[in-house]
Amino acid sequence: MLQSRHTDDSLIEVGIDEAGRGPLWGPLYAGAVIWSHEMSEEQAKISNLIKDSKKLSEKRRNYLSEQIKNLAINWSVGSVSPAEIDELGMTKANQLAFTRALEGLTITPERILIDGCLSVITHPWSFIEQVVEPEADGKYLAVAAASILAKVEHDRWILEYCDTNANVAERYDLRRCKGYGTKKHREGILEFGPHPLHRRLFLRKLLNLTV
């Protein structure tokens, strides 16, 4: 079972993580989760199932996402668009997604647990204690839960887009690749050109573009 807290104190901790950092197409999502330190029997049962989203099947992620939303003290997701990624660069866009996820909370955290190497630099979050650790989604329960929410919301957004934009989805194999740069996706870009929701920042080498 993952650690329920970074430090055994009374501070309110939130875990945050992103999904969709690597795709060539579509938005980047971030999740934020505040999980109870003193868990009910139901929360403890679900906690034993929560792990880094990359280690879970799609079916299990979808199930856990709904359980997390029902059982967490507070949760939120935020996103940034491909246009914002192109304008800001990935580092600042990632931090903006974190900020938007935090802004969606109705409880103000007193400590932020972050997977990776990026802190939250926007006011007022920059004044809150931050614990930034690589692979925190494999260590802290709240961060792993946040990674699940972010991944599920990212993939759900793409699948819902595919449902209403079948031609675009087929051209770039979006339903299968979820925006990542698979061979078929890259072939679609070369044949049909970039779509407005492609991250032109990520296509410079493929298409010799200037952003």
Report residues per predicted region.
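RNase H-like, Mg2+-dependent phosphodiesterase core
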Residues: M1-V211
